[in-house]
């Protein structure tokens, strides 16, 4: 099972049912459960991480705010943004939390490099940046030695809602997206590249693709 990965493409979903399904999957998984990555686009939502502060919500308007249990501060999810949730048994992979964060950042950096986009991580603010502008946000939670939550990569979306918050708690943080810096507009092309990089980085040998929604996710 250590080298087996199931990739689920969930399409467009509300945030909360997928969040609940992640919890269920993590609570019910055993040492024999293969790792999974869920790829999803969310309907518009602001999510507050565990460190989130109300003052970073400037003007949320008609977009709902959900209190999440991932690490980090407030961010925005919406159509045209690739969200990848990493349901990985870290003990089995012999990875620490910091290792996983570094792997995920490198995964995004390598994905962008395939489109000749130079990007970098920052030691003071998790995520991936292009010319100082944030292109990918990151927030994880670990339970029973297993990770859930993951990354949000801006591909081809309306970035306007980010102006209604201090993204990840940083006032004036500028956001950018793949389609603005010479990359593709097609989110599926970016998904494909991301999974290719993940399989290489984390040494998966068997990859199974599925569009079957998780137990909670199909209620969205």
UniProtKB/Swiss-Prot annotation:
Regions annotated as coiled coil: none
Site positions (Lowers pKa of active site Cys): 134
Keywords, ordered alphabetically: Acyltransferase, Cytoplasm, Transferase
Family membership noted in the UniProt record: Belongs to the LipB family.
Subcellular location: Cytoplasm
Organism: Vibrio campbellii (strain ATCC BAA-1116)
Residue positions of the active site: 168
Chief place of localization: cytoplasm
Record's protein name: Octanoyltransferase
Keyword Transcription tagged: no
């Amino acid at each position: 099972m250590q080298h087996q990965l199931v990739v689920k493409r969930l399409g467009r979903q509300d945030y909360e049912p997928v969040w609940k399904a992640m919890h269920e999957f993590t609570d019910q998984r055993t040492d024999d459960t293969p790792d999974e990555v869920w790829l999803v686009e969310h309907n518009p939502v602001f999510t507050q991480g565990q460190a989130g502060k109300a003052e970073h919500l400037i003007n949320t308007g008609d977009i709902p705010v959900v209190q999440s249990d991932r690490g980090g501060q407030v961010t925005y999810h919406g159509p045209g943004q690739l969200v990848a949730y990493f349901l990985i048994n870290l003990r089995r992979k012999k990875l620490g939390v910091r290792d996983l964060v570094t792997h995920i950042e490198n995964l995004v950096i390598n994905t962008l490099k395939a489109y000749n986009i130079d990007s970098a991580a920052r030691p003071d603010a998790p995520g991936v940046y292009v010319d100082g502008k944030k292109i990918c946000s990151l927030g994880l939670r670990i339970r029973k030695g297993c990770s859930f939550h993951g990354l949000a990569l801006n591909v081809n979306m309306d970035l306007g809602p980010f102006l209604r918050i201090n993204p990840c708690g940083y006032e004036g943080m500028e956001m950018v997206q793949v389609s603005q810096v010479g990359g593709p507009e097609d989110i599926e092309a970016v998904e494909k590249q991301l999974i290719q990089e993940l399989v290489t980085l984390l040494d998966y040998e068997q990859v199974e693709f599925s569009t079957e929604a998780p137990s909670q996710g199909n209620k969205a």
